[in-house]
Amino acid sequence: RKAIALGLDPILAICIATKHAADHYGFQRRGSIEPNLLANLIVFDDLNNFRVRQTWYHGKLVATNGVMNALCTSELDWSTANDSVHLPKLTEQSFCVKGKTELIRVIGLIEGQLITEELHERAKIEQGKCVADANRDILKMAVIERHHGTNNIGLGFVKGFSFQHGAIASTVGHDAHNVAVVGDNDADMLVAAQTLNPQGGQCVVSDGRVLAHLPLPIAGLMSDEPSEFVIDKQQAVLEAIHILGCPLDDPFMPLSFLPLSVIPKLKLSDLGLVDVEQFQIVPLEV
């Protein structure tokens, strides 16, 4: 409406908003009215006010003059949304990081920000394995692919959570929303990951015991319970991680962005550590 009011030809304005946009983003079956394209159409009264008269979806009239067609029913299959956490068979060995290197890359949290630092820290080696060092606030992190059964597990280390004797896990991890786990020992990391299979959500584990769990059964992202239930469970999760010594107000917020490998500097995906500035997978060893 604004473009036409400013003098742009109506046909060109419609092309820019439909066909040009579809072509730009590679939507091959959308953007124009042609054979073999999706019959998703909007019928306007005129080319000035653009008041919508009819809406067609997949060749069916679904709304007229702003009113939904009473016969229009959802064809969505919600079963997959309630069955979205599919973890591989996990053991403590799944979280093992072999190595004898002196220096490793560590993700450094910056409180209140989504960006991270790339820290180079001295590795703690025990029996040929690189392990967490909670006394120096260097915890182990894992990102486990949960959608397609790839068995991918990315492993790394992170500094800034500052808790001991436990692990946290979440299925909220932008943008792929895999299972992200942080802990100071492999046993608790295993329990935390298994706790989220298949209900998803967020949890806190210590000494093999689940201290708190907020289930998020819808795609691992949302709850089907009343808001009061969600608030109580979320508060219990936060209280539990604070008991373990974490000073962050809500550690699940930075955790949810650590797998997001488009925000600098160092992130962890299910394929491994990502140097976002270089857009490359990088090794743990420096």
Please give the residue ranges for each predicted region.
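Active-site microenvironment of metallo-dependent hydrolases
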Residues: 1-286
